[in-house]
Amino acid sequence: MIIDCHNHVGADLMFYLHGDFPYAQHLVAMTREGRALGVSKWVVFPFVVPIVFKIEALKRGEIIFDGTGLEKVPYAFENRRLMKEIYEFFPDEGKDCLPFAMLDPMREQAAQIKELRKLRGEYKFYGLKLQTTMIQSFIKTLGNEGRGFVELAAEWDIPFLIHSSVGEQDPWAQASDILDVAEKFPHVRFCLAHSCRYDKECLDRVNALPNTWFDCSAHCIHCDGAVADMPYIAERKRRFDSDYTNPARVIADLAAAYPTKFMWGSDSPFYSYVGMLGEKRLALISTYAKEVAALKANKPEVVDRIANRNIRAWLKLKDESLLADQ
């Protein structure tokens, strides 16, 4: 069995209006493409920027939270829309998906928690997802003003999956800050996305902490970034040592170095990304097929460990039948 632990379903108004890519993914299209490649199950969550922000600003690529957005509570609309798609609109495809709810740790915390409790009473979801870079929300707040979300995760015994960065241009989602939060709450499980941008110090901290994992979402374009020494990748002096011209080799090396903490995820459809990095437009292009091929180039034991067993340990499902072959 191959579980893909990192996928977005829905639409992103800022990406569409600002001319960035990708801006949407349909649940049925994701499962059909993935299943043809050998993927069996998917962890899924909404797209990144909720419709609570000023629409005119989104078109300029700006985040302004002034009460004029289409909704008032971050991700309330997006989370409910995802649950309806999985459980009501497309239950045949939805039965192979484990939905996570998204949240903003910095804005309207009490209102979000109220909405999450209400949603939990109507639908099952299995974790909480944060992407704080695009919404310019400091991940540090999760351990302070936003600790109510951590208390929810502890109460429901569900994990976090958190977008991580290491570049100076991104103060909102620093991997070291996420690890500080995880260290503060040792009884809650955390996954840091994107292999901590190959920052060895952060990967070693993930390995040392009992409650942290990392995923390799958008692996191929991150390998490309390492080869080109792009600023969204850890500097060479801090970088995990591997042959980044060979994404399959990097997976093998990470799996050997961090045998129980490394999880595979594609980041569909964000295995490709076109957008701005500072003053430059990035065009990073990969495919779902390339992500799966880099995984499958490894030994069957490695594939089963990072795309099945480690993910199950992080999810810690009360009902393992959810991951049974249908």
State where each predicted segment sits.
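A structural motif corresponding to the C-terminal end of an alpha-helix
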Residues: 33-40, 82-98, 152-157, 185-187, ...
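Active-site gating/metal-coordination segments in enzymes
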Residues: 60-169, 173, 221, 236-239
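Glycine-enriched alpha-helix->loop->beta-strand junction motifs that scaffold or abut catalytic
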Residues: 122-127, 148, 155-159, 184-189, ...
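H/E-rich (His + Asp/Glu) clusters that bind or coordinate divalent metals
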Residues: 196-326
